[in-house]
Amino acid sequence: MLPFIAGERATGWSTSATGVLEGIKISTTPIEILQAMLESVAYRFAMVADLLLPGVKSGYQMIASGGAIQNSPWWLQTMSDVLGVPVGVSAEEQDTSRGTAILALNALGVWDGLDTHAAHIAETYEPNHERSEVYGEARERQAELYSRLLG
């Protein structure tokens, strides 16, 4: 599945991309479609992480924020499994905006506050490495689908 209901949502990517559900059968259930959608979003997050993390200092922590993911333990576990790293759940509202501002200021050299303003974590999800391997194969299939359909 390609989860681009609103196009791709990152700079330089195709804002006109559309969602794709491949391999659906008469026996496919609504919950399987929902699961595929949430997993496909996690694969895209992992691709972004692959691009960003080489530029991040060691010792980073992956933090999930936002109502949709914070209210879904299954999705949080899936995100941890797909990323292959622990995922902390923010105990604060607006942590996405806060984190973005902190990273931007840090990258610009204006503020070196990453260590002084740690996020408050309510819970941490640890990856299941067996599932991480399965999800790695699924990420490859998603990349192949993307390449075939969007170049």
Question: Locations of the language-model features?
Answer:
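Glycine/Thr-rich phosphate-binding loops that ligate phosphate moieties of nucleotide
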Residues: 1-151
